[in-house]
A protein has these predicted regions:
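Ferredoxin-type iron-sulfur electron-transfer modules in oxidoreductases and energy-metabolism complexes
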Residues: 108-110, 335-359, 373-470
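Glycine-centered loop/turn positions within well-structured domains
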Residues: 261, 369, 430
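Iron-sulfur-associated redox domains of electron-transfer enzymes in respiratory
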Residues: 1-354, 358, 372
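Residues immediately within or flanking Cys/His clusters that coordinate Zn2+
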Residues: 23, 294-297, 358-364, 368, ...
């Protein structure tokens, strides 16, 4: 970095020093874009010298983490460039990358990165002239955006007051109704064990505090009397199914409506087999988060879903359930209004909001531990050759960790909100996850709870949108 660039990066005031020039990192495909850049050089085409290239075998190998690292290390802009669709030397690498970067681009805009800083282009080996043109346009765009905002905590900033969330939530159940559901649940769990349908039942047991429950693993029918049900049943029990299957061929799991998406996701991704599970869906009154209902419950009906094997309600236990009404499934999420409000704010205000959120992160990784779909044997944050995500509690590292975790869950997140619930710093991880879910649904449709459908970001279509690609 030049002295002017260092000064601009540290100031965070939005002013542009007189001698400032943008630093741009280009992640390029070896077979096409790198060759196109080489052709531009050998034919002596002139273009700005602000770009530093990093060569990859394929755009499909370019992780969004590398873009984040470029910004973290002081780049003012990033260009990603590869082969045209249909020309990939690895057949479909750029098609998968196109979907991935479509969603990642939306997230970067949401957290306050001006999209003038982030560009994508198809440049073939024979398009030296296009490479020179793209670099010129990207440089001008980043120059207009100015120095990258500081990752530091925005001291003296009053923050943003988000709109209040509203929603009716599930049907209210009185104490007698909850007791009836609990008794029916105990009966169903006992019959599952005595009938040999499963070797273990994962449910909720009494905790050490009032209105608190803990995960309970039952292998004897007599212990089913310990099962509890109510608004203190917060945990997503699908997190524990994998370890239980290490000891038993089949496992039964008690599931709220919001837990079913995680179960479907684990089956979809080959982490579980449907025949290994007995899913006990229970009529849910919503769970408490402090004095009121949890955010995720405000737009939930609490009804079980046909993915369940057994359905427990006030009226008893039955082997299957009717499909909830389309209206119940399509109820707007209570967080959507807050997301829409954030999107109306200028980029710098959004950036300050999220930097303040990420600045509180303790790097305890409770979000990772609670998430049913964070199942990698070695997380990217634990890999240190090289150390992709800084482990210290600093602002660039905190931002990279929280953003890349959300990206890894894009198109997969079930919306159970366990990450936000267990976060000791109260970071609004649920807003990021919900924003990505909305964008995936808008671009590629909704997969719902069908475990046979592919996740959007491991699939592609030749006709996928690419209006943002140069």
């Amino acid at each position: 970095m030049t002295e002017a660039n260092v000064t601009a990066a540290q100031s965070g005031t939005g002013s542009v020093p007189e001698n400032w020039k943008p630093h741009i990192v280009a992640l390029v495909c070896n077979w096409c874009s790198y060759a196109g850049a080489d052709m531009a050089g050998t034919t002596r085409l002139e273009y700005p010298a602000n770009v530093r290239m990093v060569r990859f075998p394929c755009t499909g190998r370019m992780s969004p983490l590398m873009i984040l690292r470029a910004f973290e290390q002081g780049a003012d802009g990033v260009l990603v460039s590869g082969c045209h669709p249909g020309d990939c030397h690895y057949v479909q690498g750029n098609l998968v990358a196109r979907r991935r970067f479509t969603i990642f681009r939306s997230l970067m805009d949401f957290i306050g990165i001006d999209l003038k800083r982030l560009h994508f282009a198809w440049v073939s080996a024979a398009e030296g002239h296009k490479w020179a043109k793209v670099v010129s346009e990207v440089t001008a765009s980043v120059q207009e955006a100015g120095p990258l905002p500081s990752f530091d905590h925005p001291e003296g900033w009053d923050g943003i007051d988000l709109p209040e969330m509203a929603g009716s939530g599930p049907q209210e159940l009185d104490e007698d109704q909850l007791n009836a559901i609990r008794d029916n649940l105990r009966k169903a769990a006992s019959e599952v064990l005595t009938g040999g349908r499963a070797g273990s039942v994962i449910g909720y047991g009494p905790g050490s505090l009032a209105n608190q429950t803990i995960p309970l693993f039952i292998t004897e029918a007599a212990d089913c009397e310990k099962l509890e049900w109510g608004q203190g049943c917060r945990n997503n029990l699908s997190t524990y199914v994998g370890s239980a299957l290490d000891k038993h061929e089949r496992v039964a799991v008690v599931a709220k409506t919001c837990d079913l998406g995680a179960i479907s996701g684990l089956i979809r991704e080959g982490q579980l087999r449907r025949e290994q599970l007995v899913v006990i869906g229970v009529q849910c009154p919503g769970v408490r988060d402090g004095p009121g209902l949890a955010t995720k419950c405000l737009s939930c009906s609490g009804d079980p879903h046909p993915i369940c094997d057994l359905v427990v309600t006030v009226d008893g236990v039955r082997e299957s359930c009717e499909d909830p009404s389309a209206a119940a499934l399509d109820t707007p999420d209570a967080r959507d209004e807050q997301i829409a409000y954030l999107e109306t704010l200028p980029h710098d205000e959004r950036w300050k909001y999220w930097q303040r959120q990420f600045g509180r992160c303790l790097r305890c990784y409770a979000c990772r531990a609670a998430c049913p779909l964070c199942y990698c044997s070695t997380c990217i944050t634990d890999k240190h050759r090289p150390q992709w995500v800084p482990t210290s509690i600093d602002h660039p590292g905190n931002s990279t960790w929280n953003i890349i975790r959300a990206v890894h869950l894009a198109g997969r997140c079930s919306g159970c909100d366990e990450c936000a619930r267990v976060c000791p710093a109260d970071i609004r991880l649920d807003l990021i996850n919900r924003k990505l879910s909305l964008e995936v649904e808008r671009q590629y449709g909704k997969i719902g709870l069908d475990p046979e459908k592919k996740s959007a970001l491991v699939d592609f279509r030749m006709e996928d949108s690419e209006e943002f690609i140069l």
